[in-house]
Amino acid sequence: WCYLVTGRVERLKKKYGLTVSWTHFPLHPETPDSGLSLEELFKGRGYDIDEMKQRMSSLMTEEKLPYGNRSHTYNSRLAQELSKWGESFPEGEELNLKLFEAYFVEGYNLAEPEVLLDVTQAARLSREVAEGVIRERLFRDAVNADWRRAHEFGVTGVPTFVSGNRGLVGAQPYEALEQLIQAK
C-alpha cells in the first residue's frame, strides 16, 4: 500500500513544499527471509488471493504505477535498514521507489543482500558502502527506534500518515491526504 500512494505523496510534496519523513513499520516481521507465498500469508483469513491481486493491479494502473504478478511476500527488515541509510542522501527517495519496484513489480526477495545491492546501485548510491551498511547492520538501531515509535503511535497498518497531531491509516485518496496536511 505504501507503493500505491507514492505518486499522491509526490504531488502533495510539490504543491505544498512538504518534507516527508518515513517511519518504518514491522509489517509481518515473522516472515522468514526465504519468504512466504501469498496463500501461506493469508491462509485461513478468507481472502481470495487472485481477487486481491487483480484489485491491486487495477489500483496501480489508476495511479500509473507498474505492477507485477507478485506471488510472495518477503521479510523487509534489511530493506528498511537500507532505506534508513538512504535518508541521508538526495537519492534516498529514489532508493525507496526502486525498492518498491523491485518488490512489487519484479517480485524480488528484499531479504537477499545481493538484491538490495543491485537496487542501491540502480538508485545511484554506492554499492560498496551499502554492502557495509547491510553486513554490519549499521541502521538496525534506527529501524528499531522507528518500530518503537510506530508502536507508541498505535500504528497497526501501512501506510499511516501523520501531520501535526492527526493521522490517517491506509491508502487514502489524494483529497483526504490534502485535508490532513491543511488541517495542521
What is the predicted function of each stretch?
Residues 3-106:
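Structural alpha/beta surface segment adjacent to cysteine/selenocysteine redox centers
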Residues 1-18, 22, 84-184:
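C-terminal cap of thioredoxin/glutaredoxin-like
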